[in-house]
Structure formats: structure tokens, C-alpha cells
């Protein structure tokens, strides 16, 4: 669950950046100019809210996984990480091509690690 927590931390950081620093960060990253950044600030806050939800749920899951048990924790992690992958792909198609690199790729690595480390089914 370590990589699940890492993806959670990334998404909390995305939330802070999108909610608190959209109008200054977006022009510096050359995503939009200053006028467009100001005009899309509310959209940035909305994106930040969703990233925060993903981040906090992933962090909660990493913390509570031992209590949930391996199979339920893995199922919940898979659902959340798949949502992160989809959100990253959509962001890459609609906003900027780098979004999947920073959002989907870490989630895919966490998914691959999660599933490769899981027990093989008993026959």
C-alpha cells in the first residue's frame, strides 16, 4: 500500500496547487496565459476538489488497509487507482498531454505493483 499512499500524496499536492495556486502556477507552466488562467480558476478549483477526494481516499485506504483485509483493500485500491488513470487520460486529451504522465503513470505503477504482489488464486 506504499505506492497507493504515494499516489494519494501526489493528488493532495495537485489539489493544493489547483485550488490555491491556479492563477499563478498555470501561466508559469505555460498551460494557459494569465488571462486564461484567471478565467478558468473556478475550473481549476473543481479539478482540485476531485484530486483531493482521490488523494484523501487513497491515503485513508493505505492507513486502514490492514483493518479492511487484503482482498477488500485491493479491490478498493483498484477502483480508486483506475479512476485516477481515467481522469489522467481525460486530462491529457482535454487539457495538456503531460497530465497522464504525472497522474496516470504513477497510478498504473501502483496498480501493477498491487496486483503483482497479491496472492495467486487458490485452486
PLM regions with names:
Residues 9-18, 29-63, 79-82:
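Core segments of alpha-helical transmembrane spans in multipass integral membrane proteins
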